[in-house]
Every structure is written in C-alpha cells, then in structure tokens.
C-alpha cells in the first residue's frame, strides 16, 4: 500500500473503534506496523481526529514513524507534553495503545542514554488496573534495562555506619515503593528517619512515608503539617475527601516538583485511592446503587466502575456484593447477643489479669490494721 491508501485505511480503522471495537482492534493490531512504515509523521499531524480514543490510537503510529527516522528527542517531547497522564493506565480501553507508546518511549530514551526508572512505577500501576498488554511491554523493557546494566538482584546489606545504613534503607524503601510493597517501604523509610541526621534525606523519607501510607489507605500521618510537606498534605486531604477534581488539580499544579523528585507517577497512583474512598463513602450511605449512579457521583467512566468496586471489595475496604450492574452494601450489625458476649469477655479478661498480677493490691491504711500488725 502507498501512503494515501494507508492513511485511508488508518482513518477507517480509527473511526470504527467507537462503533465496532473488537473488529477495529483486530485490524489495528494487524496493520499498525504497516501504517508506521508507510505514513509520514507530518501526514498524521494533519489528520482531524474528533475523539480522544482516535487521537490516542494514532499516537503509536506517529511515534513509530518518528522512531524509524531516529527522531528520539521528538518522541520524548511528544509523550511528556501530551501523553504522560495516560501512561499510568487509568483507562483500560487504551491498554494496547499505551503499551505501544511506552515501547517507543523506552526505545527512544534508551537510544538517548536517558533514565527509564519511571517504568517501575508504571508497572505497578498498570498491574493494579489490569492493563495486560502494557504490563507485558513494561516488563520486557525493564528486563532489557536491568540486564543491560548488569543488575540482576538486590545488593546485600553489608553496611556498618549509621549514616550509610540510613541511606541504604532509604534506597531500599524507594525500590519497595515503586514495586508496590508499601508495608516494607514504610519500614525502610521509618528506619531512615530514625537513623539519619541528614535533613534532606529525612525530608525525602517523610514525603515517601506519607505517600506510602495514603496508598495503604492509612490516613494517620505521623508528621505535623509544614511548608516542605504542603503538597503531600494537600494530596492527603483530597484523597480523604474523595475529591478527584481537587486531587488532579493539586497533582498537575505541582507536577514539575514531583517529577524532579521522582514521585509524580507514585503520587498518580493515588487516583485509585481517591475513587476507592468515594466508593467506601457511597457504601455507607447507599444500601443499593447502580454502577451508572456511582460513575455519576464520582465523575468517572461507567465502564470502569465494576472493576473498581470489585477491587475495593477484595481489599476489604467495603463489604458488599455486585449483581446485574448493582452494588449491594452489606453492613455488620452487632446484635444484643454479640454485645453481651463482648461484655462477658471483657469481664473475664479483667478478672484474669487481676488474678495474675505480680503484686497484691495495696489496701488503704486504717487504725485497726496497724494495731493488728503491731500486736503480731
């Protein structure tokens, strides 16, 4: 096919995505590399694509064509300016397209000898959101990157000084955090805070502690609010209030700072916690509610609701069941019998503790007792 025929075919495939997605995706997957080889980036830029889905689907072709021309910096620029928010995989309908975008971004940055460590964070998020193709692409990219750098496993701890031990825990906390093991990450960051006398290192650990706690749905932040942690307390406030709009505003207005600290994509993961908190609040208020109503209340795509509700149930944040597009909240009501059993158990425990106390209870002094002891 010549360029004109390829463009006509691509436009037809893209327009079919909204009406007959299965057939359109089959055609796209079979022909995408043909489009890349035969269509110039300038031609693609001139296309008038109406929907966001069509535009996202066109980007892999644009990036692929640029990669063939070895315009690596331009690929990086396009992704950073237009596609960063999509790489986290929030919309699973974009899974295949995002996977291709990540592949070309990784290859471009690799050719420019640039850092690709953000892929660790993207891997965790896309795993959580069920983006199978993107996860497959990122996994292979990371394997390529690690093997290329001769990194095959974690480094054993053989550090003896306190200051270096603090830094070692800080670095290991970052590894655990990007992998999604927030419990282990918190242990490392807490250890770093305790051992370190370096103010910058402690501040970096505190920022990551807050993010890990929020990602674990734990809002008992152990630090006072101060200017250096302002962004993180704003994010915490948005998550607790389930305010997705405020969360996204805070994230985007502080994007440069978060990117410079390598925390933008980690903080971006909190979007799911915002929605989870919203679902939790809905489960308290409503005993029965449809997916469409949940989507309307939270301002999200109705197609994503079922997955998110089931995920929230699996995490144990809410109790309920789903059937035929309806969520039914299940509340645990304590019966009078349960309360009675609880009181009985408390009394038995108190008696047991008293019986096993090391020293007898001290009784108040009185004349009769003193006289009795004196007479003995």
UniProtKB/Swiss-Prot annotation:
<keyword id="KW-0647">Proteasome</keyword>
<dbReference type="InterPro" id="IPR050756">
    <property type="entry name" value="CSN3"/>
</dbReference>
<comment type="similarity">
    <text>Belongs to the proteasome subunit S3 family.</text>
</comment>
<keyword id="KW-0963">Cytoplasm</keyword>
<protein>
    <recommendedName>
        <fullName>26S proteasome regulatory subunit RPN3</fullName>
    </recommendedName>
</protein>
<dbReference type="Pfam" id="PF01399">
    <property type="entry name" value="PCI"/>
</dbReference>
<dbReference type="GO" id="GO:0008180">
    <property type="term" value="C:COP9 signalosome"/>
</dbReference>
<dbReference type="InterPro" id="IPR000717">
    <property type="entry name" value="PCI_dom"/>
</dbReference>
<keyword id="KW-0539">Nucleus</keyword>
<dbReference type="GO" id="GO:0006511">
    <property type="term" value="P:ubiquitin-dependent protein catabolic process"/>
</dbReference>
<dbReference type="InterPro" id="IPR036390">
    <property type="entry name" value="WH_DNA-bd_sf"/>
</dbReference>
<dbReference type="GO" id="GO:0000502">
    <property type="term" value="C:proteasome complex"/>
</dbReference>
<comment type="subunit">
    <text>The 26S proteasome consists of a 20S proteasome core and two 19S regulatory subunits. The 20S proteasome core is composed of 28 subunits that are arranged in four stacked rings, resulting in a barrel-shaped structure. The two end rings are each formed by seven alpha subunits, and the two central rings are each formed by seven beta subunits. The catalytic chamber with the active sites is on the inside of the barrel.</text>
</comment>
<feature type="domain" description="PCI">
    <location>
        <begin position="159"/>
        <end position="336"/>
    </location>
</feature>
<comment type="function">
    <text>Acts as a regulatory subunit of the 26S proteasome which degrades poly-ubiquitinated proteins in the cytoplasm and in the nucleus. It is essential for the regulated turnover of proteins and for the removal of misfolded proteins. The proteasome is a multicatalytic proteinase complex that is characterized by its ability to cleave peptides with Arg, Phe, Tyr, Leu, and Glu adjacent to the leaving group at neutral or slightly basic pH.</text>
</comment>
<dbReference type="GO" id="GO:0005737">
    <property type="term" value="C:cytoplasm"/>
</dbReference>
């Amino acid at each position: 096919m010549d360029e004109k025929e390829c463009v006509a075919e691509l436009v037809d495939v893209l327009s079919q995505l909204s009406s007959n997605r299965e057939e359109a995706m089959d055609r796209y997957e079979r022909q995408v590399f043909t489009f890349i080889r035969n269509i110039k980036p300038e031609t693609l830029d001139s296309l008038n694509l109406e929907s966001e889905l069509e535009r996202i689907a066109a980007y892999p072709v644009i990036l692929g064509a640029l990669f063939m021309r070895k315009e690596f910096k331009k690929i990086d620029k396009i992704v950073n300016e237009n596609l960063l928010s999509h790489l986290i995989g929030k919309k699973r309908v974009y899974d295949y397209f995002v996977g291709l975008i990540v592949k070309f971004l990784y290859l471009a940055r690799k050719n420019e000898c640039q850092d690709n460590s953000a892929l660790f964070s993207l891997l965790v998020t896309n795993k959580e959101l069920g983006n199978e193709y993107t996860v497959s692409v990122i996994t292979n990219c990371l394997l390529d990157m690690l093997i290329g750098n001769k990194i095959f496993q974690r480094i054993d701890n053989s550090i003896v000084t306190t200051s270096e031990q603090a830094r070692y825990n800080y670095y290991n906390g970052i590894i655990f955090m990007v992998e999604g093991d927030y419990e282990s990450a918190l242990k490392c960051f807490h250890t770093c805070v305790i051992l370190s006398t370096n103010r910058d290192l402690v501040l970096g650990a505190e920022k990551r502690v807050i993010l890990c706690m929020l990602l674990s749905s734990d809002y008992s932040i152990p630090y006072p609010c101060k200017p250096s942690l302002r962004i993180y307390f704003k994010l915490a406030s948005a998550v607790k209030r389930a305010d997705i709009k405020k969360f996204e505003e805070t994230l985007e207005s502080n994007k440069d700072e978060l990117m410079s600290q390598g925390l933008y994509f980690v903080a971006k993961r909190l979007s799911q916690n915002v929605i989870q908190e919203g679902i939790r609040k809905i489960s308290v208020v409503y005993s029965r509610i449809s997916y469409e109503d949940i989507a309307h209340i939270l301002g999200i795509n109705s197609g994503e609701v079922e997955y998110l509700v089931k995920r929230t149930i699996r995490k144990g944040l809410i109790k309920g069941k789903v059937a035929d597009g309806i969520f039914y909240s299940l509340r645990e009501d304590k019966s009078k019998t349960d309360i009675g059993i609880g009181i009985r158990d408390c009394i038995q425990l108190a008696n047991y503790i008293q019986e096993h106390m090391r020293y007898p209870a001290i009784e108040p002094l009185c004349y009769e007792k003193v006289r009795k002891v004196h007479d003995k």
